[in-house]
A protein has these predicted regions:
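Acidic/histidine-rich catalytic neighborhood of metal-dependent amide-processing enzymes
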Residues: 1-87
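Active-site-adjacent substrate-binding region
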Residues: 64, 71-179
């Protein structure tokens, strides 16, 4: 939807935007796997790990990246993660601050959510692109939404208000970015 809105808008952002879709983030090695390591992330983040080591353009670089992961649950809450804060605190503050200004503070919580290995980590480490993670991670038990990795993880649990909060926040950040 973000790509469609930018494409159809008569006013374009002042900066270039690349949208990259990663696959095989949740692949992971089975608990009983005894073979050679699949990658340094336990077999997770395969798509982002591959992309970050085989960039689509020679000498590709980006000022920053925003990873959107599981951003549609009705009761989603997004806390900043430690990896994002370590490499891109100004971008985290910009995104969470923008969400607050737009009235989405009930989704974008101003507190540390701890660490998580997600697709932004290989991009940060291999491609050297500061990337933040917007991910619905429950604070107290470090789990995801109730339907995560179940048959209940379907379009019926997607909430348009959550998508609106994330989409409007990201669009506002992109349109406010100066070259």
């Amino acid at each position: 939807e973000i790509a469609r809105l930018i494409h159809s808008s008569s006013q374009k952002p002042n900066v270039g935007i690349d949208i990259i879709l990663f696959d095989a983030e949740d692949w992971g090695a089975p608990n009983d796997y005894t073979g050679a390591p699949i990658n340094e992330y336990g077999g997770y983040c395969l798509g982002s790990d591959y992309w970050s080591k085989n960039l689509h353009k020679a000498n590709y670089s980006a000022y920053f990246g925003i990873l959107l992961d599981m951003v549609g649950d009705k009761n989603a809450t997004f806390r900043y993660d430690s990896e994002s804060m370590q490499v891109a605190p100004s971008i985290v503050n910009q995104v969470w601050g923008t969400a607050q200004k737009l009235g989405f503070g009930n989704y974008f919580i101003l507190e540390d959510g701890g660490g998580i290995v997600d697709d932004h980590v290989p991009v940060i480490r291999n491609a050297k692109i500061p990337m933040i993670d917007i991910i619905d991670l429950r604070k107290n038990d470090k789990t995801f939404f109730d339907q995560h990795h179940t048959h209940g993880d379907s379009i019926e649990v997607i909430d348009k208000n959550t998508l609106k909060a994330v989409g409007q926040t990201v669009l506002q950040v992109l349109y406010e970015e100066k070259p």
